[in-house]
């Protein structure tokens, strides 16, 4: 579905242009709506879902028993802090300041298409992740059977 890396600039109001290559697909799949939430695994990164995929993720998470602290924290971080965003006539979404400041996204960001969702990274965090990945000689046994 979504793939690729795009350098993004946010304006003073926190608006970013969604790359044109994705707009038609988002319009068809989600009536120009995206759901923004925190990435619970990576600092400096937000997730953007089309509405239908978000509903699947949300529903799967919310049926988990929240008596377990880790489940409750995930529910709070992903569902409780989510924001419904709508593309405007210029193909822009407005990223809430609370989300931008929490992950240190300023004027420059990176949008990654990750199949069923997007990752929106602060430019600095994405650069650090790439440097760490490139310098990490051991990517783990999980990649041994992957044909690249």
UniProtKB/Swiss-Prot annotation:
GO-annotated biological processes: negative regulation of DNA-templated transcription initiation
Location(s), subcellular: Cytoplasm, Nucleoid
Domain SpoVT-AbrB as annotated: residue spans: 5-53, 82-125
Signal peptide span: none
Family: Belongs to the MraZ family.
Subunit description: Forms oligomers.
Protein known as: Transcriptional regulator MraZ
Organism encoding this protein: Xylella fastidiosa (strain 9a5c)
Organism classification: Bacteria, Pseudomonadati, Pseudomonadota, Gammaproteobacteria, Lysobacterales
Name of the coding gene: mraZ
